[in-house]
């Protein structure tokens, strides 16, 4: 897994640019409806992305199709912030996040807990995207990780 923090049961998230989420949902339905644990739904708010969850060949997947280009989607931005933080750290952040993930926390709440980000962990991580590497290193150091 790309971040190296997967735990048993972690799914493979695939973020897709879907200019027409209905067409995306139709394609996903056509190809994966027979997969184990298949679920397909649309959010009722925002850009109303189409989300599919299923198990294929023993691997749990989540496909997320949104109107926005991938690099503008929150899931991708979270991934990029997490990747940057892990690259700036010598391994302590990865271990701390992995321990919380093993205890059942999802990825973003685990990062927020380790980094001392208050409030909504998803918004908190989004706020880090504009920070320079030096600021991220300082944040890691303040948490005893840098």
List the predicted regions and their residue ranges.
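A short acidic-to-branched-hydrophobic micro-motif
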Residues: 60-67
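Metal-dependent nucleotidyltransferase catalytic core
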Residues: 16-57
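Active-site nucleotide-donor binding segment shared across nucleotidyl transfer reactions
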Residues: 1-23
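Catalytic cores of NTP-dependent nucleotidyl/adenyl transfer enzymes across multiple folds
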Residues: 69-146
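Solvent-exposed, flexible loop/coil residues
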Residues: 5-9, 42, 81
């Amino acid at each position: 897994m790309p971040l190296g923090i997967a735990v048993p049961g972690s799914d493979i998230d695939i973020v897709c640019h879907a200019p027409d989420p209905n067409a995306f949902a139709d394609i996903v339905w056509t190809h994966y409806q027979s997969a184990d644990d298949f679920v397909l739904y649309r959010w009722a708010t925002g850009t109303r992305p189409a989300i599919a969850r299923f198990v294929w060949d023993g691997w749990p997947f989540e496909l997320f199709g949104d109107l926005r280009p991938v690099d503008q989607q929150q899931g991708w931005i979270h991934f990029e912030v997490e990747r940057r933080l892990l690259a700036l750290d010598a391994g302590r952040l990865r271990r701390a996040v992995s321990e919380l993930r093993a205890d059942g926390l999802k990825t973003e709440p685990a990062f927020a807990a380790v980094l001392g980000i208050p409030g909504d962990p998803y918004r908190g991580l989004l706020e880090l995207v504009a920070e320079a590497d030096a600021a991220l290193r300082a944040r890691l150091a303040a948490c005893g990780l840098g």
